């Protein structure tokens, strides 16, 4: 299980991403449409002024039950270990063990 501080840090990142999403998207659109290099430089500086953790690339998918960061299935939000346990116990409707 991941440390509680890591889980809370990830939650904080998620809140920051949501808070600055509109502003960041507007600046990036302005950056893409800017013609002169000086304008691009100015806009780039504005983007750099935003909090580092407000960038979506810093977000890490984590299991909502254990906080595990690797082997997380997006469809369920669970790590592979928990997914396997719950599937065997029949706690995930529609999930069956494959056989051929």
Curated annotation (Swiss-Prot):
PANTHER family (alphabetical): 30S RIBOSOMAL PROTEIN S14, SMALL RIBOSOMAL SUBUNIT PROTEIN US14M
Pfam families reported for this sequence: Ribosomal_S14
Gene giving rise to this polypeptide: rpsN
Superkingdom assignment: Bacteria
GO CC, any one term: small ribosomal subunit
Family according to the record: Belongs to the universal ribosomal protein uS14 family.
Any one biological process term the GO annotation gives: translation
SUPFAM superfamilies, per database record: Glucocorticoid receptor-like (DNA-binding domain)
Annotated organism of origin: Nostoc punctiforme (strain ATCC 29133 / PCC 73102)
Subunit structure: Part of the 30S ribosomal subunit. Contacts proteins S3 and S10.
GO MF terms, alphabetically ordered: rRNA binding; structural constituent of ribosome
HAMAP family: Ribosomal_uS14_1
Record keywords, A-Z: Ribonucleoprotein, Ribosomal protein, RNA-binding, rRNA-binding
Protein name: Small ribosomal subunit protein uS14
Described function: Binds 16S rRNA, required for the assembly of 30S particles and may also be responsible for determining the conformation of the 16S rRNA at the A site.
């Amino acid at each position: 299980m991941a440390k509680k501080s890591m889980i809370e840090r990830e939650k904080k990142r998620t809140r920051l991403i949501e808070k600055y999403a509109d502003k960041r998207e507007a600046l990036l659109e302005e950056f893409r449409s800017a013609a002169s290099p000086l304008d691009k430089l100015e806009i780039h500086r504005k983007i750099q002024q935003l909090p580092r953790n407000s960038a979506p690339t810093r977000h890490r998918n984590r299991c909502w039950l254990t906080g595990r960061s690797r082997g997380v299935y997006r469809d369920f939000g669970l790590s592979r270990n928990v997914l396997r346990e719950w599937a065997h116990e029949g706690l995930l409707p529609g999930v069956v063990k494959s056989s051929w």
